[in-house]
From Swiss-Prot:
CDD domains found in the cross-reference section: IHF_A (cd13835)
PANTHER family: DNA-BINDING PROTEIN HU, INTEGRATION HOST FACTOR SUBUNIT ALPHA
GO molecular function: DNA binding; structural constituent of chromatin
Name of the protein this chain belongs to: Integration host factor subunit alpha
Protein encoded by which gene: ihfA
Keyword set, alphabetical order: DNA recombination, DNA-binding, Transcription, Transcription regulation, Translation regulation
Transcription recorded as keyword: yes
HAMAP family referenced in this protein's UniProt entry, alphabetically: IHF_alpha
GO cellular-component term (any): cytosol
């Protein structure tokens, strides 16, 4: 199950004690800051969590899976996320405990 912005707001309300309006503003502002930084071409480093950055992908050949026809995939910029070591360790510990 995915964690939604609405669930984040609810958790801030329950665990931090912000009222729902403040919690929603906090979550919206956080994501606005991330978006603004990426739009400016900046890398985002969240200590203990991971890094977001823009990566330029060159044009490359692709193939239509139905017809087999070669089609070019145009150059584009994508957002990438690389998880930090602490996040990897916590996820590994959680996944390991479920197996």
């Amino acid at each position: 199950m995915a964690l939604t912005k609405a669930e984040m707001v609810e958790r801030l309300f329950d665990e931090v004690g912000l009222n729902k309006r403040e919690a929603k503003e906090f979550v919206d502002t956080f994501f606005d800051l991330l978006r603004d930084a990426l739009e400016q071409g900046r890398q985002i480093k969240l200590s203990g969590f991971g890094n977001f950055e823009l990566r330029c992908k060159n044009q490359r050949p692709g193939r239509n899976p139905k017809t087999g026809e070669e089609i070019p995939i145009s150059a584009r910029t994508v957002v990438t996320f690389r998880s930090g070591q602490k996040l990897k360790e916590r996820v590994d510990a959680y996944v390991g405990s479920r197996q």
